[in-house]
């Protein structure tokens, strides 16, 4: 029969399989696969940030060093970084110099050390017979003039246990020839001017050098070299001296010892004065 022979169409399981698989979501990627796929993008962004920062750093460092950017348009990355490191080191030295200059004890310590070194040079020149008299006079005059510049500046007063002595160069000696104090050009980086023209120069190794200006010689009888003596030392047969002491140093083929040229008022000369010289260290 036609009605019996007709059958209802049934869905084939094979035909329905693609439809069910198309509706299922994709499997999520693992963390390692995600990092691997995003690594080129992150690397590109990182390089872009580095190049942008180096470009800005190049502009800043050239402006800070006051260099023409057109002449340094092809600076390598290593050159930019080296210039930046050097500039930052110089800035750090300048800041340290400013901090030391603000400290009033710095000049006092330097003055005491300079005074002691000057005394040692004077003793050597007084006992050495092979030094020319003119050279000896010029050197001592130069040192005394440099010390006079330091004395004219503001500094901490020495303790009460120390009293100033003076050794005056006689006016009969020839006028000393100016011998400017020199500092290594490599160390002359951003000098800091102190009071009275005194300069504190930072060195490349992190230390500091004191630059003394060339003094202007006046028509005074002679430059005065202040020394220090311990007031606790008393001369035999006389009371303790509390006033400054003056002496004269003469120059000849054989100069007398500097200790013998300094004599306290109303006291003895010679070894007692040599023992009374104050040493800061």
Curated annotation (Swiss-Prot):
Basic and acidic residues: compositionally biased ranges: 26-35
Domain of life (superkingdom): Eukaryota
GO molecular function annotation: protein heterodimerization activity; sequence-specific DNA binding
Keyword 4Fe-4S: no
Pfam entry (one): Hairy_orange
Any one annotated GO CC term: nucleus
GO biological process, one term: prechordal plate formation
CDD domains with a match to the protein in the record: bHLH-O_HES1_4
Motif window: WRPW motif: 278-281
Residue span, Orange domain: 110-143
Keywords assigned: Developmental protein, Differentiation, DNA-binding, Myogenesis, Neurogenesis, Notch signaling pathway, Nucleus, Repressor, Transcription, Transcription regulation
Region annotated Disordered, chain positions: 1-44, 262-281
Subcellular location: Nucleus
Domain bHLH residue range list: 34-91
Low complexity composition bias: residue spans: 9-22
InterPro entries on file: bHLH_dom, HES_HEY, HLH_DNA-bd_sf, Orange_dom
PANTHER family: BASIC HELIX-LOOP-HELIX TRANSCRIPTION FACTOR, HES-RELATED (PTHR10985)
Description of its domains: Has a particular type of basic domain (presence of a helix-interrupting proline) that binds to the N-box (CACNAG), rather than the canonical E-box (CANNTG). The C-terminal WRPW motif is a transcriptional repression domain necessary for the interaction with Groucho/TLE family members, transcriptional corepressors recruited to specific target DNA by Hairy-related proteins. The WPRW motif is also required for the inductive function, independent of transcription regulation activity.
Subunit structure: Transcription repression requires formation of a complex with a corepressor protein of the Groucho/TLE family. Interacts with the bHLH protein hes6; this interaction may inhibit the transcriptional repressor activity. Binds DNA in the form of a heterodimer with the bHLH protein hey1/hrt1. Interacts (via Orange domain) with id3 (via HLH domain).
Function: Transcriptional repressor. Binds DNA on N-box motifs: 5'-CACNAG-3'. Promotes floor plate development and prechordal plate development. Required for lens development as early as the stage of lens field formation, partly through regulation of gene expression of the cell cycle inhibitor cdknx/p27(xic1). Required for formation of the neural crest downstream of multiple signaling pathways, and acts at the neural plate border via both DNA-binding dependent and independent mechanisms.
Protein name: Transcription factor HES-4
Annotated organism of origin: Xenopus tropicalis
């Amino acid at each position: 029969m036609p009605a019996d022979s007709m059958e209802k169409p049934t869905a084939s399981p094979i035909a329905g399989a693609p439809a069910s698989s198309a509706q299922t979501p994709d499997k999520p990627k693992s963390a390692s696969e995600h990092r691997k796929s995003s690594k080129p993008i992150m690397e590109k962004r990182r390089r872009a940030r580095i190049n942008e920062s180096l470009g800005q750093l190049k502009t800043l460092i050239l402006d800070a060093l006051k260099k023409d950017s057109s002449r340094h348009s092809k600076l390598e990355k290593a050159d930019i970084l080296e210039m930046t490191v050097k500039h930052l080191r110089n800035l750090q030295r300048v800041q340290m110099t400013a901090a030391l200059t603000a400290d009033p004890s710095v000049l006092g310590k330097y003055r005491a050390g300079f005074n002691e070194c000057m005394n040692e040079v004077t003793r050597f020149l007084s006992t050495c017979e092979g030094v020319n008299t003119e050279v000896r006079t010029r050197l001592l005059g130069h040192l005394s003039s440099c010390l006079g510049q330091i004395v004219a500046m503001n500094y901490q007063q020495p303790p009460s246990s120390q009293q100033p002595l003076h050794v005056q160069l006689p006016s009969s000696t020839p006028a000393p020839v100016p011998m400017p104090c020199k500092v290594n050009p490599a160390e002359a980086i951003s000098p800091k001017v102190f009071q009275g023209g005194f300069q504190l120069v930072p060195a490349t190794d992190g230390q500091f050098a004191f630059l003394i200006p060339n003094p202007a010689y006046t028509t005074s009888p002679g430059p005065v070299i202040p020394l220090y003596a311990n007031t606790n030392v008393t001369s035999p047969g006389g009371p303790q001296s509390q006033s400054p002491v003056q002496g004269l140093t003469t120059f000849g083929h054989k100069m007398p010892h500097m200790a013998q040229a300094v004599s306290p008022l109303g006291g003895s000369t010679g070894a007692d004065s040599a023992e009374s010289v104050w040493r800061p260290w």
